[in-house]
Design a protein with these regions (language model features):
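Helix-to-loop junction immediately C-terminal to a conserved catalytic motif
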Residues: 48
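Conserved ABC ATPase signature
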Residues: 88, 127-131
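Conserved ABC ATPase "signature" region
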Residues: 108-123
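Hydrophobic anchor residue at the start of the ABC signature
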Residues: 141, 180
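Catalytic Walker B motif of ABC-type/P-loop ATPase nucleotide-binding domains
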Residues: 152-156
Length: 201
């Protein structure tokens, strides 16, 4: 279980949010909503361990997440708002590099399967710089297939996706949750995935 207690975030001299409490259990996902500037991305960066809260605690499996940050991050996959891909590498090479940075190895067949699931068959050997914004986003999202993680932390994952890709991603998140996974997702749009609850910032 992921538990957040009395979490506060300050940027410069501005308080983005304070006193945030929530929990996400296996088989659940949390939809984080709020206006631009309300702190949605900052909250997800706190959950991913990329920044520190002004106050409060994040707990994972009953222990403070920063007590064993390495073990926590091994079970977490964070995908940010921007499509963080290497423009000079191919779509396939991007997935293999991401796996290598996570300490694993991804075969060409495994990478191809993930890219095909996101409608990128035939584009696997193209340098990413030749892909559209939506296709770059799908290369990033293919990591949801190749990287096994209990907790998905996804910042605006539906950005730049067409209707078909949105449906595909909703299905993938739904499958992950149904299999006992967890997800925390920010999105400006309505999301049709069972097992969800909402947090308004």
């Amino acid at each position: 279980m992921l538990t957040v207690h009395d979490l506060s975030c300050v940027r410069g001299d501005r308080s983005l949010f304070a006193g945030i409490d929530f929990s996400v259990e296996a088989g659940e996902w949390l939809h984080v909503r709020g206006a631009n500037g309300s702190g949605k991305t900052s909250l997800l960066r706190l959950l991913a361990g990329l920044s520190q809260p002004a106050k409060g605690q994040i707990r994972w499996r009953g222990k403070a997440a920063d007590d064993d940050a390495q073990a926590y991050r091994a079970e977490l996959l964070f995908l940010g708002h921007h499509a963080a891909v290497k423009e000079e590498l191919t779509a396939l090479e991007n997935l293999q590099l991401a796996a290598e940075l996570d300490g694993g190895v991804l075969s060409r067949a495994e990478a191809l399967d993930a890219l095909q699931r996101f409608g990128l068959k035939g584009r696997e050997d193209l340098p990413v710089r030749f892909l559209s914004a939506g296709q770059k986003r799908r290369v990033l999202l293919a990591r949801l297939v190749t990287r096994k993680a209990k907790l998905w932390v996804l910042d605006e994952p539906f950005t730049a996706l067409d209707t078909r890709a949105v449906d595909m991603l909703e299905t993938l998140i739904g499958e992950h949750v149904a299999e006992g996974g967890m997800a925390v997702v920010t999105s400006h749009q309505a999301v049709s995935i069972p097992g969800g609850k909402a947090l308004e910032l």
